[in-house]
């Protein structure tokens, strides 16, 4: 071994080592891989062309794709340079019997390795071999099909197998910058969710078709997104508490900032029911006679309003009492006659209205039939005897005040012991409403609102009496220093001015401390 063989080893990384082994600038590596575009594809849509045209540089486009691009951008999609539509050259590709592009002179099929050229003056496309042998070497610069003369500069290279840079899709200007022309038909088709379903079987397509026929999601979504109508606040429906929007916006950044307190609006039904103070009266005309009913509108306003509205709507006309149990109840109010149908006047079930002073005691109590708590609709029943165990289960809203003989005749009708259905039909022919307290309440509310419209709000009066913000400044009396001092304040009366006389002041008389008399006692 030689001496001093490690003498040049350093205890640190040298510049040459860092550059070549450990760091330094690396040689450029192309970030994108080469992607070859076939010769029969449009350089803009990257799809097979139908109406081929080319630029003077030999870049091929489809006429249907390049025209909208030029109208919007006016540039060459592959290079980004300016391009005029007049400079485009229409190409005439020849096809063989199998539908393949080929040279019309040598009949050789064009492939990705064929040297393809086009003549500018005619647009005919040939192989370079045919043009070289029959035109260039023969010094006969005439088109091989039309015999039209051309120059050497009119030969445009469409594809050169030795130079494929213009066929590299990764280097296209519109691909790098993600530029494209949006087709209106395609944009409209994208709005349909089925546009994104590429491969579906027949069962899926049939299911989707049925869904689209019955789908109402857009209407429901539009209804939910629509802002609720703001109710008008007046002296009648204004609550003694606010909406709480000020405090909510103060404590939560998700709320819209509010700086003024607004009174909450009392529900219209709650307001109307405050004015209902009377009983309602309805007559049921049955095939067994008439039943006169008194309704407790002042105690159960919601239930009574539902019954009166349905009677006025002639909802019960032609319905039957589908259930009758002797010494218990008779039930009706179902248009289907099955005991499972019927709906309320508002189209949805409403809550129970239990009152401690109303009980199923005695004969002829009118009560609501339901299928559970807060499921009142249109069905009702009339008791034949006391049923106190039904309290707080069914809403009592009236009683029979006339026609007990009719009620007895209805009870005497025999029923099927299995279904409790009367063997003889007990029918409600028509209904008559004699007293409707809700119409009177609506008229009274309308009259009260007319009165309040002519009265000025007390808060508005206070605001009108307050001075405007622009008139709150002090009054000026002159210009310059002391312009705010009233002239009368600078004048003093003669009594207030100090006396200039030299008269000596009178000496104060000391009070005597003698005994005196008893006059001060």
Swiss-Prot record:
Keywords: Acetylation, Coiled coil, Isopeptide bond, mRNA processing, mRNA splicing, Nucleus, Spliceosome, Transferase, Ubl conjugation, Ubl conjugation pathway. It is found in: Nucleus. There is a cross-link at residue 216 (Glycyl lysine isopeptide (Lys-Gly) (interchain with G-Cter in SUMO2)). PROSITE patterns: CSA_PPIASE_1 (PS00170), CSA_PPIASE_2 (PS50072), U_BOX (PS51698). SUPFAM superfamilies: Cyclophilin-like, RING/U-box. It catalyses: S-ubiquitinyl-[E2 ubiquitin-conjugating enzyme]-L-cysteine + [acceptor protein]-L-lysine = [E2 ubiquitin-conjugating enzyme]-L-cysteine + N(6)-ubiquitinyl-[acceptor protein]-L-lysine. Pathway: Protein modification; protein ubiquitination. Residues 447-462 have a biased composition (Basic and acidic residues). The keyword Transport does not apply. Residues 35-108 form the U-box domain. One of its GO terms (biological process) is RNA splicing. One of its GO terms (molecular function) is peptidyl-prolyl cis-trans isomerase activity. Residues 447-521 are annotated as: Disordered. GO terms for cellular component: cytoplasm; nucleoplasm; nucleus; plasma membrane; spliceosomal complex. The keyword Coiled coil applies. Residues 465-478 have a biased composition (Polar residues). The modification N6-acetyllysine is found at residue 483. Its EC number is 2.3.2.27. PANTHER family: PEPTIDYL-PROLYL CIS-TRANS ISOMERASE-RELATED, RING-TYPE E3 UBIQUITIN-PROTEIN LIGASE PPIL2. Component of the minor spliceosome, which splices U12-type introns. Within this complex, interacts with PRPF8/PRP8, EFTUD2/SNU114 and PLRG1. Interacts with isoform 2 of BSG. Interacts (via the PPIase cyclophilin-type domain) with CRNKL1; they may form a trimeric complex with HSP90. Belongs to the cyclophilin-type PPIase family. PPIL2 subfamily. Has a ubiquitin-protein ligase activity acting as an E3 ubiquitin protein ligase or as an ubiquitin-ubiquitin ligase promoting elongation of ubiquitin chains on substrates. By mediating 'Lys-48'-linked polyubiquitination of proteins could target them for proteasomal degradation. May also function as a chaperone, playing a role in transport to the cell membrane of BSG/Basigin for instance. Probable inactive PPIase with no peptidyl-prolyl cis-trans isomerase activity. As a component of the minor spliceosome, involved in the splicing of U12-type introns in pre-mRNAs. This is RING-type E3 ubiquitin-protein ligase PPIL2. It comes from Mus musculus (Mouse). The lineage of its organism: Eukaryota, Metazoa, Chordata, Craniata, Vertebrata.
